[in-house]
């Protein structure tokens, strides 16, 4: 009996920390945005996404994916700092500073608040709000 429990205990010890999974989802979203990868964005964004840009423009999932993959503006990189994740069961709030670099434009810094939800084991961004801040 003691040996039967050992594999279960070992698998629990190596279970991924949900906060790390949220950070991985945030990283997956930024990588998909930089690559203009519609399938990647589909994976990391919740169907009922509400995305509010620093300038006040809001978009749903369909609008955001179209703008990122077909729009004239292209993301070059996102660099997060002071990133914090707070878990609320199957929801999480991520806050951070983010330096955003766009192709052919001056980079800028935002303070971002993102809400993630767990859908069938996959963490997805459900809401995003950012505000421009100085460096």
Predicted segments — roles?
Residues 16-43, 50-135:
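A beta-strand edge to alpha-helix "cap/lid" segment located at domain peripheries
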Residues 3-13:
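Sec-dependent N-terminal signal peptides
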